[in-house]
Amino acid sequence: MAGLRIEYKDPRGLNPRARNPRIHSAKQVRQIAASIAQFGFVSPILVDSTDGIIAGHGRVAAAKLLGMCDIPTVQVDHLSPAQIRAYVIADNKLAENAGWDRNLLALELQELSVELHFDVAVTGFETGEIDILIGELGQTEPEAADNVPEIDRSKPAISRLGDLWRIGEHVLFCGDALDKISYRSVLGSKKAQMIFTDPPYNVPVAGHVSGKGKVKHREFAMASGEMTSADFTKFLKATFDRLEACSIDGSIHFICMDWRHMGEVLAAATSYSELKNLCVWAKTNAGMGSLYRSQHELVFVLKSGKAPHINNVELGRFGRNRTNIWSYAGVNTFGKDRDAELAMHPTVKPLNLVADAILDCSKRGGIVLDSFAGSGTTLIAAEKTGRRGFGIELDPYYVDTIIRRFAEAYEIGAVHTQTGQTFEQMSAKQLTLKGARGEKEKEKKSKSKIKIRKIKRTSKAKATNGRPQRRKGR
């Protein structure tokens, strides 16, 4: 056999085999095209002396899809027509006879999903399949991932309105979910791939969320029972408009709500293209209630835009079987972490509930946005699932809580983007300033006491015309 020589040819001049038994779907051709766009055309097409394709029909179709004019080819002229026909079959079938070491494959995919700055699905594996493979590694999730530091409101918060924090691959902004500036600050020109958010339910925390136990929460900054039905609908509508404007076409939005306000959510969601489903979080224990104690919450699954939505479930194709009944324990379940979870936020959602929703409708490395970040469960779930969590939270104390939660669970520190300082540095600075203010206050009080004593002595002297008083009985 003579030495092989690469020759570049126009793919439109190459002739597909009339009896090629290998079928390439349009989806697979798009996948091959994505691979070529990412890695280049690194595998030449095998052709015969008449430019008939021997191996590489899918790559030729992908090259045409990409509009390529020159692709590498190698002419095979040492095989008989019968041998060529046999090789066409062997080239495809022999590759199918190989297997995968699923553990090593999962490790490679897991590391690549962190290292690469593009969709790891370019490897040919679907996102849902990759998530399942990585999940099979059986890595132990840090216990602290479900725990949240208790908020101490007796001390001033470190964060302030307008602060933008970067926490590893995640971004957190302290601001109003109704303000355009908040979204510009946290996202810039990027768009979210998926939304998971838990707006306030427009019910008072006292009597509905916080009962007569030792854990008491202050009311939310907004929509904590003070709004009429019309006002709350307007509030939700404004929120949804902001979320739709900053998410990709075809994105899925998971909106949490209680049964009292189903009507307002549906009335506010008219701009969404579709209500995909209504999921029910079925808790293991009942909470508060009047006639019936509440043992569920609702998650509205809304679609924004007309483009195909991301579906990693695919009716259990890769072993991911999901229904619209989500069974997870609530914080009212008696357990070792119950008090800590209750203390961190009045309406905290289970980490796995949010993580599973993220796995359903987003890709690895994609942006998941939460405009009511609360205790940060969505951002923590994004870290757990290999996504990027972007959050907006109005309450500075909760912003601090999210930052501390990342530090405790994953040892990921936060950097204040406006100053470049870490959260620890800003905390230490606040303590230093507080100490300095305390010393000044002590000095001020000391001077004030000295001044008062001087005034008393002066007043006493004036009362006796400047003469010392004689002691009685002398």
What spans do the regions from the language model cover?
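S-adenosyl-L-methionine
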Residues: 161-185, 403-442
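Intrinsic disorder/low-complexity segments
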Residues: 145-146, 358, 415, 429, ...
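Intrinsically disordered, Lys/Arg-rich low-complexity segments
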Residues: 443-474
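Core catalytic lobe of class I
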Residues: 2-399, 445, 472-474
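Short, solvent-exposed coil/turn linker segments
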Residues: 8-10, 152, 204, 422-425, ...
